[in-house]
UniProtKB/Swiss-Prot annotation:
Its EC number is 1.-.-.-. The gene is cctM. One of its GO terms (molecular function) is FAD binding. This is FAD-dependent monooxygenase cctM. Pathway: Mycotoxin biosynthesis. FAD binds at residues 37, 52, 112, 306. It comes from Talaromyces islandicus (Penicillium islandicum). Keywords: FAD, Flavoprotein, Glycoprotein, Monooxygenase, Oxidoreductase, Signal. The keyword Transport does not apply. InterPro entries: FAD-bd, FAD/NAD-bd_sf.
């Protein structure tokens, strides 16, 4: 390709929040882009969850057109209008007594599926495209998919999550592998009896955290608000440190959670033990990958979102950093005089310089926080207690 040739196409692998927001940024700046998603359709996954935007609200507004920004509240778990007095209350899981109220001004709590549907508006997405290979000649890059189809562009951005194939291509399997955490978690989205809904929402209408001196962390929050309490669904997560494999799967996950809840204070014990027996649970060991520099093959391949900085969830930093990735990529694009392949390479270089440092700090701090909130002696010095939900630097 001759110097100064116009950018033909950017390939984005993964239609999660990071991928779709980067696609919106590229569209905003007139750069052709296609998103390739391994799922066969937008709602193919049976599991949904929710997440918070705590400090990246202005970055998000940089990524989206005004007509989508104005619809963000419609993607929330409830009808709450963000305000400066928003908090996330934290309780003692053994006694039910309040611990602290974490400030969360103007925060959004978004249903993942609703949010992705909103930010996919106007984006070219190809579904059923599971990546099998990446090949760059330092000028163009080709993605090969499981269905034998291929796509070629001037830049490929891997945004396909913690177990990124693109990250493996850039760093090799060993260096790209996530690091298993000492922490395991059981999670569900479930309806609850009306009495338990009322008890929970008296603590806070939207959500709360409860932490046990014996090393448990419990998240309880609205996932889908309904007019009738009996129709509301809640996302519930219980995590703890386990050095060995728990062996939990199927119905054993719920039974184990309810057994552990025997030592919890009210209303948490009754809430957890009232989860209907037919409810589906998930159980997994957490993992992370402290961001490290990679060879972007002359700016033709890079990473963003969980592919660049997969982290533990206990301080809600993952989505905020994914949004920041997209916003910073957009800022670098906005500074260009042209959209040539050479200038796009310069965008990638500047983008990665900021991302590598911020991503490593975010992952490291999230790991520290996750271990601290499972250790009663260290809880008060945890990033959650000392910095709340806002962005924190390790320096």
């Amino acid at each position: 390709m001759e110097p100064g040739t116009d950018v033909r196409r950017v390939l984005v692998i993964g239609a999660g929040a990071a991928g779709l927001l980067i696609a919106q940024v590229l569209k905003k700046h007139g750069v052709p882009c296609t998103v390739f998603e391994q799922d066969t359709k937008a709602d193919a996954r049976p599991r949904d969850w929710n997440y918070g935007i705590y400090w990246a609200q202005s970055y998000l507004a940089e990524c989206l057109p005004p007509e989508l920004v104005s619809q963000l509240e419609s993607a929330q778990v409830d009808s709450h209008t963000p305000s400066g007095s928003d908090i996330l209350p934290t309780f003692n899981l053994a006694t039910g007594e309040p611990l602290i109220s974490v400030s969360a001004p103007y925060s959004y709590r978004l249903q993942r599926r609703k949010f992705l549907n909103l930010i996919s508006t106007g984006i070219d997405i190809q579904y059923g495209k599971r990546l099998t290979m990446v090949d760059s000649d330092n000028k163009t890059v080709t993605a090969v998919f499981e269905d034998s189809s291929q796509a070629t562009g001037n830049l490929l951005i891997g945004t396909e999550g913690a177990h990124s194939r693109v990250r493996e291509y850039l760093l090799g399997k060993e260096r790209a592998a996530v690091i298993p955490s000492r922490i395991v978690a059981s999670a569900t989205v479930s309806r609850l009896p009306e009495r338990e809904v009322s008890a929970l929402r008296k603590l806070h209408p939207r959500y709360c955290i409860a932490i046990h001196p014996d090393g448990y962390f419990n998240w309880l929050g609205i996932h889908d608000e309904a007019a009738q309490s009996k129709d509301c669904t809640f996302m519930i997560i219980l995590s703890w440190i386990s050095e060995s494999d728990t062996g939990l799967s199927g119905t054993a996950i719920a039974a184990d959670l309810k057994e552990r809840a025997n030592t919890f204070g009210e209303p948490f014990r009754t809430v957890l033990q009232s989860i209907p027996s037919e409810t589906t649970f998930w159980h997994n060991r957490l993992s992370s990958w402290p961001t490290q520099p990679w060879n972007s093959h002359n700016g033709t391949v890079t990473l963003a979102g969980d592919a660049a900085h997969p982290m533990t969830f206990h301080r809600g930093q993952g989505l905020n950093n994914a949004i920041t990735d997209a916003a910073y990529f957009g800022r670098q694009l906005a500074a260009l005089d042209t959209k040539s392949t050479e200038s796009l390479s310069a965008v990638v270089t500047a983008f990665e310089e900021e991302l590598w440092k911020r991503g490593n700090e975010a992952v490291t701090q999230s790991d520290i926080n996750s271990l601290s909130v499972h250790n009663w002696e260290e809880l008060k010095s945890s990033p959650l207690f000392t910095s709340g939900l806002k962005q924190r630097s390790s320096t």
